A protein has these predicted regions:
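Rossmann-fold NAD(P)-dependent oxidoreductase module
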Residues: 46, 79, 205
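S-adenosyl-L-methionine-dependent methyltransferase catalytic module, highlighting the catalytic core
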Residues: 95, 103, 107, 141-245
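Conserved SAM-binding loop
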Residues: 54-59, 64-170, 199, 240-242
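N-terminal, positively charged/glycine-rich alpha-helical extensions of SAM-dependent methyltransferases
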Residues: 1-29
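Conserved alpha-helix/loop element of class I SAM-dependent methyltransferases that forms part
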Residues: 34-62
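Conserved short-loop catalytic and cofactor-binding motifs
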Residues: 3, 27-31, 134, 190-193
Length: 245
C-alpha cells in the first residue's frame, strides 16, 4: 500500500493492538456494537427512501454497491450484507481485515474485504451507490484529503453517510473525559479532540465534493444504562446523510 497522507501511524498501531477484540461484545468495542443497531436502522431507512426500496422486505438493499471505509472488524459491513447489499469493506489495518474476513466466513457472508485506502480506490475509478464514512473522520491525519477521496467514490446517483464527533467543549467533556477516563467506556487515547470535526466543516467538505446534506441527526448516550438513541442535538456525536443527485 503506497504512502497516503490521511494515514496516521499511531492510529494504525493503536487499532492493530485491539484487532482481536472486535467481536467481543463486552470488550473495548462494545460501544460500537451498541451503536451498530441504531446506525443500521438509520442507514436502512434513508437508503430505502432514497432508492425507493421496500423497507419491510428481507433484503431491501439487494444489488446496491456499498463501500464501508475504515471497516474495522466488519461490524457494520456484516449488518448491511445481511440486508442484501454487495459490500466492499476497506481498512488500512491488516489485522482488522483478517479478523473481519474470518468472521464473515463463519457467518456465510460474502463481503469483499481489502487492505486498502479510499484514495487508492478513487484513483482506480471505483464508484459505489453508498459510501459509509462512519466513525472514521476523527482518526484520519488529513481530513480534507480523506473527505474528497470519499466523495470521489460516490456514484452519480449515490449517497454518503458520515458519522463522527463534533468539536466543542462539550464533546471534549463527554467523548474524551467522560468516555475514556471517568466511565472508561473506551480505551484511553482512542480520540484526539483536535481531530474532531464540526458539522459545518464536514458539510463544507461534502459540498466541495459535489454532495448535498439531506438529513442530519445526533446520537446521545445514557451513562446510567449505556443505551444510545437518536436525537436532534449534534453537540457531541452526529450523523450526516448526503446525496449526489
Amino acid at each position: 500500500m503506497k504512502h497516503d497522507s490521511t494515514i496516521d501511524a499511531n492510529e494504525v498501531a493503536f487499532y492493530s493492538r485491539l484487532a482481536d477484540t472486535w467481536w467481543d461484545r463486552e470488550g473495548p468495542f462494545w460501544p460500537l456494537h451498541q451503536l451498530n443497531e441504531l446506525r443500521t436502522a438509520y442507514i436502512i431507512d434513508k437508503l430505502c427512501r432514497h432508492f425507493d426500496r421496500d423497507a419491510t422486505s428481507d433484503r431491501p438493499l439487494s444489488s446496491l454497491r456499498v463501500l464501508d471505509v475504515g471497516c474495522g472488524g466488519g461490524i457494520l459491513a456484516e449488518s448491511l450484507a445481511g440486508f442484501g447489499a454487495r459490500v466492499t469493506a476497506i481498512d488500512v489495518v491488516e489485522k482488522n481485515i483478517r479478523v473481519a474476513s474470518l468472521h464473515a466466513a463463519q457467518q456465510n457472508l460474502d463481503i469483499d474485504y481489502r487492505v486498502e485506502t479510499a484514495s487508492a480506490l478513487a484513483d482506480a475509478g471505483e464508484k459505489f451507490d453508498v459510501v459509509l464514512n462512519m466513525e472514521v473522520v476523527e482518526h484520519v491525519a488529513d481530513f480534507a484529503a480523506f473527505m474528497q477521496d470519499c466523495c470521489r467514490l460516490v456514484a452519480d446517483t449515490g449517497v454518503m453517510f458520515v458519522a463522527t464527533i463534533n468539536r466543542n467543549p462539550l464533546s471534549w467533556l463527554f467523548a474524551i473525559v467522560g468516555a475514556e477516563y471517568v466511565l472508561r467506556w473506551l480505551p484511553r487515547g482512542t480520540h484526539r479532540w483536535d481531530w474532531f470535526r464540526t458539522p459545518a466543516e464536514t458539510t463544507e467538505q461534502l459540498s466541495k465534493g459535489g454532495l448535498s446534506v439531506v438529513s442530519r441527526a445526533g446520537v446521545a448516550a445514557n451513562p446510567f444504562n449505556r443505551r444510545l438513541r437518536i436525537t436532534k442535538s449534534m453537540k457531541v456525536n452526529y450523523m450526516l446523510f448526503a446525496s449526489r443527485s
